[in-house]
């Protein structure tokens, strides 16, 4: 690090990514993030090219960050593997859960960390429903043992919510410890809803930043 920046850190860096058969060159400011994060990527059956294009352009990945992904595509198992690896085999302060079908804007980690919250994420649309509502919810009563939710309307700024998709959220080590090992489960519905319900029972606030718009590949970008 000292050798590389002996003459002072560069102000900008050039990122080159091939998109649509052409090389795209982008000038990005150099931002040194001192706080490490584990990037947890639960892989889908396929890895989307757009994910890697935007990761190279926007991630601002630091040499001291961690990286964890799985070959298993069964989502609860994959998320639990990443969660447990962060909890038991890492000492880093943050885990970023980032699905392989999520495309994200620049400086995502820095923007989420700046909130200094236990767990916070950007938002994206539901690509399975025709109306594509935000994957952000309120819990509602049901007549069985499953977790029932209704989608929220898109808001603005930072908002505390009851539930949201796990495709992009940043949690602190304290939250991971409070949830314990292997907290993801499909027993009562979506594995991310199970986490959100546990957070609610633990009194841990969950927030969405509506200003961080993500793309759910299959819906469209932003």
Set out the residue ranges of the language-model regions.
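Short, high-confidence coil segments that cap the C-terminus of an alpha-helix
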Residues: 91-92, 117, 204
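Anion (oxyanion) recognition and catalysis
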Residues: 60-61, 113, 200
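Conserved catalytic core of nucleotide-sugar-dependent glycosyltransferases
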Residues: 83, 105-186
């Amino acid at each position: 690090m000292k050798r590389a920046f002996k003459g002072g850190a560069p102000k900008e860096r050039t990122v080159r990514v091939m998109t649509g058969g052409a090389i795209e060159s982008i000038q990005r400011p150099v931002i040194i993030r001192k706080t490490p994060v584990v990037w947890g990527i639960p892989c889908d059956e396929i890895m989307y090219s757009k994910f890697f294009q935007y990761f190279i352009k926007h991630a601002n990945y630091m040499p001291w960050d961690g990286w964890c992904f799985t070959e298993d595509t069964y989502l609860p198992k994959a998320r639990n593997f990443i969660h447990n690896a962060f909890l038991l085999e890492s000492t880093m302060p943050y885990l970023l859960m980032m699905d392989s079908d999520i495309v994200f804007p620049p400086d995502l980690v820095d923007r989420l960390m700046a909130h200094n919250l236990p767990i916070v994420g950007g938002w994206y649309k539901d690509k399975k429903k025709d109306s594509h509502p935000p994957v952000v919810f309120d819990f509602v009563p049901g007549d069985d043992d499953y977790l029932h939710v209704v989608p929220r309307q898109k808001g603005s700024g930072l908002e505390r919510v009851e539930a949201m998709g796990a495709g992009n959220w940043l949690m602190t080590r304290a939250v991971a410890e409070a949830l314990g090992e292997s907290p993801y489960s499909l027993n009562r519905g979506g594995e991310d809803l199970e986490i959100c319900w546990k957070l609610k029972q633990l009194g841990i606030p969950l927030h969405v930043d509506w200003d961080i718009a993500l793309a759910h590949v299959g819906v469209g970008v932003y």
